[in-house]
């Protein structure tokens, strides 16, 4: 089984679950030598980094590769959604040429080829590209991942960091739009269940068992941490400017315009069945003392 991002976040949990089930794991990464490999996985470069087909002999490909936002700032290599789309198409083509038996691909809730948001539009384009390969596949659509450590749960951890450092926090508008976070271990188990299926194609909304409005997430998080902060509704433009200022202070991109728009359009929640048993409300109580003690930087992960 080949897994992208095996040294990163969700890929690491998927790899560990695969080994528990008896799979031999091959990691696809461009971070060899930069990130630790304590499990000692065999590592191969991403297909777009080499002229070789790195998927030869692979039975199943699990893809978690993506970028959260496009970036062209100083101090880091540029990356973009457009580049991630093209790279992933090359990955799918490599899988097709190598005769990979099944692909499990990580998408997003409510992808849309007509969206003005590159994140959701790109994810929809990739779902179509995967289907066009003719390979048996499963498409998993998570909204937000959390667990197992606070630093790995960037959104939740940095909301907690804001509560610890700011006199008030904000929602964009009234904050009634919802999120359905799924624990990374539940997601890993789902990915392996799908890897071992024989269905030709399926799409699963990989959302957790609890649904919260953005406003209620602030309140629940503050309550778990034993503190109170006013939650102020602000216009999206003002919230973005505040995120820019805070991002400058911590040397990171805290939140983008597109992410605010995706939240406000209620794209991170879907009706229907949910996946997994691990609840964010329980996890917050277990990790309340350590949440937000340190800011979790997206850009630092990419150095």
Predicted regions and their residues:
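Conserved glycine-rich Rossmann-like NAD(P)H-binding loop of the short-chain dehydrogenase/reductase
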Residues: 23-30
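N-terminal Rossmann NAD(P)H-binding glycine-rich loop of SDR-like oxidoreductase domains
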Residues: 1-21
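A short helix->loop->beta-strand "cap" motif at the edges of active sites that frequently abuts
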Residues: 97-102, 135
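Oxidoreductase cofactor-interface core, primarily capturing Rossmann-like NAD(P)-dependent enzymes
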Residues: 38, 114-227
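SDR active-site strand-loop-helix element
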Residues: 4, 28, 64, 103-109, ...
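NAD(P)H-binding glycine-rich loop region in Rossmannoid oxidoreductase-like domains
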Residues: 32-98, 109-113
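Mid/C-terminal beta-alpha module of Rossmann-like enzyme folds, strongest
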Residues: 190-256, 266-303
């Amino acid at each position: 089984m080949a897994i992208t991002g095996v040294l990163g976040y969700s890929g690491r949990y998927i790899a560990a679950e695969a080994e528990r089930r008896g799979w031999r794991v091959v990691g696809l990464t461009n971070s060899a030598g930069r990130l630790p490999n304590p499990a000692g996985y065999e590592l191969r470069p991403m297909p777009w980094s080499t002229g070789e087909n790195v998927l030869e002999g692979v039975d199943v490909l699990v893809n978690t590769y993506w970028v959260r936002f496009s970036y062209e700032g100083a101090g880091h290599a540029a990356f973009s959604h457009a580049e991630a789309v093209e790279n992933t198409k090359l990955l799918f083509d490599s899988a097709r040429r190598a005769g990979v038996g099944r692909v499990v691909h990580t998408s997003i809730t409510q992808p849309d080829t007509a969206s003005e948001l590159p994140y959701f539009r790109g994810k929809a384009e990739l779902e179509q590209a995967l289907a066009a390969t003719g390979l048996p596949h499963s498409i998993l659509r998570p909204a937000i991942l959390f667990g197992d450590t606070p630093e790995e749960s960037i959104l939740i951890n940095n909301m907690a960091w804001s509560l610890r450092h700011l006199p008030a926090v904000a929602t964009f508008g009234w904050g009634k739009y919802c999120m359905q976070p799924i624990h990374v271990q539940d997601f890993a188990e789902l990915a392996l269940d799908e890897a071992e299926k024989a269905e030709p194609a399926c799409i699963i909304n990989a959302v957790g068992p609890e649904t919260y409005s953005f406003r209620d997430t602030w309140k629940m998080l503050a309550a778990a941490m034993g503190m109170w902060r006013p939650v102020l509704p602000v216009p999206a433009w003002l919230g973005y400017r505040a995120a820019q200022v805070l991002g400058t202070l911590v040397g990171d991109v805290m939140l983008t315009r597109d992410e605010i728009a995706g939240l406000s359009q209620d794209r991170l929640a879907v009706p229907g069945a949910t996946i997994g048993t691990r609840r964010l409300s329980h996890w917050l109580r277990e990790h309340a003392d350590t949440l937000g003690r340190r800011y979790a930087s997206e850009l630092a992960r990419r150095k």
